[in-house]
Curated annotation (Swiss-Prot):
Residues 146-157, 170-179, 635-648 have a biased composition (Pro residues). This is PGC-1 and ERR-induced regulator in muscle protein 1. It is found in: Cytoplasm; Nucleus. Regulates the expression of selective PPARGC1A/B and ESRRA/B/G target genes with roles in glucose and lipid metabolism, energy transfer, contractile function, muscle mitochondrial biogenesis and oxidative capacity. Required for the efficient induction of MT-CO2, MT-CO3, COX4I1, TFB1M, TFB2M, POLRMT and SIRT3 by PPARGC1A. Positively regulates the PPARGC1A/ESRRG-induced expression of CKMT2, TNNI3 and SLC2A4 and negatively regulates the PPARGC1A/ESRRG-induced expression of PDK4.
Amino acid sequence: MENFQYSVQLSDQDWAEFSATADECGLLQAGLASGDELLSSDIDQGDSSGSSPPRAPPLPTGQLAAGGRSRRGCEEEDVATQQPVSRSQGEPVLALGTGQQTPSTSARAEAPPSLGPGASPPSQFSSCPGPASSGDQMQRLLQGPAPRPPGEPPGSPKSPGHSTGSQRPPDSPGAPPRSPSRKKRRAVGAKGGGHTGASASAQTGSPLLPAASPETAKLMAKAGQEELGPGPAGAPEPGPRSPVQEDRPGPGLGLSTPVPVTEQGTDQIRTPRRAKLHTVSTTVWEALPDVSRAKSDMAVSTPASEPQPDRDMAVSTPASEPQSDRDMAVSTPASEPQPDTDMAVSTPASEPQPDRDMAVSIPASKPQSDTAVSTPASEPQSSVALSTPISKPQLDTDVAVSTPASKHGLDVALPTAGPVAKLEVASSPPVSEAVPRMTESSGLVSTPVPRADAAGLAWPPTRRAGPDVVEMEAVVSEPSAGAPGCCSGAPALGLTQVPRKKKVRFSVAGPSPNKPGSGQASARPSAPQTATGAHGGPGAWEAVAVGPRPHQPRILKHLPRPPPSAVTRVGPGSSFAVTLPEAYEFFFCDTIEENEEAEAAAAGQDPAGVQWPDMCEFFFPDVGAQRSRRRGSPEPLPRADPVPAPIPGDPVPISIPEVYEHFFFGEDRLEGVLGPAVPLPLQALEPPRSASEGAGPGTPLKPAVVERLHLALRRAGELRGPVPSFAFSQNDMCLVFVAFATWAVRTSDPHTPDAWKTALLANVGTISAIRYFRRQVGQGRRSHSPSPSS
């Protein structure tokens, strides 16, 4: 990991600068380059630019010093440790501006990674702070690593990430060799914590700051005080630095209190950090103007940073100057990461912080920077207001610092985007408290307006929101709303910009939470949002997704509604309305039934006896037969009379099979009849009768029907008297066949493949016919010859 940190984002020029700085600081390059060969982590990191010479001394340190990182003497060592970490992780970035602006971004990304791996992040805001053991690790990094850096390899520090971090940033101006060692540790911790964080450092630069917002805010406050008081090079109290955990958060701002909270861990942070946040809020309130200015600078450095410039942006690039102060300097290369680290340290989310950085970088690293930058402890609110998605995460981080779950949720949420962060913020109890001022956080979903509200209303509500969060948020509110420089302006811009970027996106998801009004109201709504997707970005997204799902059921409900209308048509359709498919089927089934009913009604209106015969008449030309039938027996009319009543009911479907049977029975009865026309009409007449019989009076009508059938058959036989004359004799058949054969041969194409078949059949048939005729002729002659003779 150490090599990875060194190699990450470090160009040859950066390495050269780092070597020079290392020489100046008396830092041993060998120690910094404990891992000369690139590690698989470097390759995995995919940092082509970071393929720095294995032992090249951490350029970030020199860069940090050059970038006006001159902090406080010993305090800057701690800060330098933080800075080196961020720089080591963002060396390429360091080149941008004294290695602070860009390095700060990269350091942020890297610092969260170190947090992710579990390197205990010192409360120094070193980018490599561990996830939860912030206090112990910070102390180790600050105290133990201090002597170690000059001679020990980066791996020697507590966590390789931390040692690397301290090695990398050895360039911090005015920082003793011990400071570089701490930087190596932190840089290593940051890189080891998450090379992914380094890769996403550019994006997560500001986002990381959100993660470290509480402590970053503290550093920012310190940096602001240093800038305002001693200036960028002004060294804040080294004493607080040594307790970096507290001092770093705010040497002059009282941020030191929040820092120990960060060290204490998520749980500790919840209780002490909130109190510390309150202290920070007070200190930050004072130093926040400075921090705000530094943040403003940072905001200049990055668009999103402006909203977040307070902490994250200041930490990130432009703010590196404001951050050049001990806290800010620490923030610059690693200050953001370090604040993130502090944030991470403050909460187990420290590890998630890399994720957060990643997520923040993806959704809105700028907003997150705002979150982190806006205020160390109070900035969380500003951050929230500024970096809606990230800012929430930051506030959540701060608030989440109060609750590790919240921070972890933020981490998850940050990867997803602003919305998740919002949900995360809501999820944590502190978040809910912070949400009031974090209306932005809650309003992350409803970004623009809620944030503005959060910036303004949320801050007083922030204090209302929760004792811990209130304190922190109170600080935030003042830095955001009243903080001079960037605080007053940047928060508004941050709110405006962040809403544009992400809050607007998620405004749909969570406008209602923000709308509730004051920050507290927003916080409470955001908490429900978090509840929906409470512990994690995914959950938040799921909660958001849940809304659309109800809408889909609504759509389904609307779809079923039409079926009820269709059901009303039939009557039992109400049951079909239950489901869309059933309704669909019901429509069609209903239509079919209606058609059948209409047909039945029409059949009932027209006499069945007349209807079927008419149909048969159309098909068969036995009109005379039917007429005779009707004339001979007026029964058809009676038949029609009984038929109409039954037809509307069962007769229609039942009559069809009966009619079919009657057709066949009629043929059997008419076996002797040659003409098919008569039986068909008779049968046609029969079906209505049978139908009528089946309808009800069928039993008594059966005999009558039989009689009628017999009469019809008789009459048909009489009528057929002329029909037998039409019967073809063999002679006629032969003539017809000859005629057909002649026609077939003449009309067929002889060239077709099957022409021979036609010719063969025609010839054979014709020959047979001719032979037949000849026999007939011979017989005729024979018959005629005797008669004349006789």
